[in-house]
């Protein structure tokens, strides 16, 4: 099995005025995603939601800047790390990630021997 990082990019504006009901729906969708990974041939190794992009601090050399590197509508909001036998399986898993206000990126994790 190989590891794949599923990066979740979303427009944070979708959550700015979110009701408790919407936030509950989002959490339930992520719980259902986590429960279904093994049925698709993968194994969920970890994951987390990130604080809003406004809380980011970026470093470039000795320069420290508040906020993310790039001004963009969609920001990295969370990730999942999955074990999967191949990229096709990782993509099948990624298609089920609830990214209501954006999309996902799948990247293989490098291994060093």
Model-derived segments and their meaning:
Residues 1-113:
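Conserved, structured core segments of small domains
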């Amino acid at each position: 099995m190989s590891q794949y990082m599923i990066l979740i990019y979303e427009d944070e504006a979708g959550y700015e005025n979110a009701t408790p009901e919407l936030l509950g729906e989002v959490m339930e969708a992520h719980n259902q995603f986590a429960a279904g990974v093994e049925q698709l041939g993968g194994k969920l190794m970890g994951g987390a939601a990130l604080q809003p992009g406004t809380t980011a601090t970026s470093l470039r050399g000795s320069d420290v800047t508040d906020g993310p590197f790039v001004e963009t509508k969609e920001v990295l909001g969370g990730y999942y790390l999955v074990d999967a036998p191949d990229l096709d399986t990782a993509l099948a898993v990624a298609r089920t990630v609830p990214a209501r206000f954006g999309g996902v990126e799948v990247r293989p994790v490098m291994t060093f021997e």
